[in-house]
Amino acid sequence: MNQVRKADPNNKTVAENRKARFSYEVLDTIEAGLVLTGTEVKSLRQGQANIQDSYASVEGGEIWLINSYLPEYLQANRFNHEPRRRRKLLLNKREMAKLSQSVDREGMTLVPLKIYFNDQGRAKLLLAVGRGKKLHDKRETEKQRDWSREKGRLLKERG
């Protein structure tokens, strides 16, 4: 019969950058692993991470997540981690080459969209390759969103 499905504790969004899709035109997304310490994983599982002001950069053939905030794990005492340290991202060589090429040549930006745990319980970062929107682009997006809402209301009233 109908079984009630429990939410999988592993497959859970921990932090989301909701302003990224408003401020950037997202052209491509890619999933990257994160190199974390034990206390960082425990802190992530508590769900208090923040990636609003963070970005990724290519340095020396490696990609780093910069300015992300993972609060200290309270039970860790002196073995705690630095909350705003740079974290290395795990990608294939081909993926790294593609991202570094798009950042260097085309002037794109690497923007983190969300941090989540996958089915195996590993922390992953959804990374977007995007171009910054100008003010008029943001206004145009907002107009389109308002019009689609209004259109939905009109269709709902008639139908």
Curated annotation (Swiss-Prot):
Keyword RNA-binding: yes
One GO cellular component, as annotated: cytosol
InterPro entries, sorted: SmpB, SsrA-bd_prot, SsrA-bd_prot_CS
Entry's localization field: Cytoplasm
UniProt keywords, alphabetically: Cytoplasm, RNA-binding
GO molecular function terms attached to this record: RNA binding
UniProt region (Disordered), positions on chain: 137-159
Membrane found in the keyword field: no
GO biological process: trans-translation
Chief subcellular location: cytoplasm
UniProt cross-references to Gene3D superfamilies, sorted A to Z: 2.40.280.10
Annotated HAMAP family: SmpB
Protein role: Required for rescue of stalled ribosomes mediated by trans-translation. Binds to transfer-messenger RNA (tmRNA), required for stable association of tmRNA with ribosomes. tmRNA and SmpB together mimic tRNA shape, replacing the anticodon stem-loop with SmpB. tmRNA is encoded by the ssrA gene; the 2 termini fold to resemble tRNA(Ala) and it encodes a 'tag peptide', a short internal open reading frame. During trans-translation Ala-aminoacylated tmRNA acts like a tRNA, entering the A-site of stalled ribosomes, displacing the stalled mRNA.
Family: Belongs to the SmpB family.
Protein name (record): SsrA-binding protein
Organism: Mesorhizobium japonicum (strain LMG 29417 / CECT 9101 / MAFF 303099)
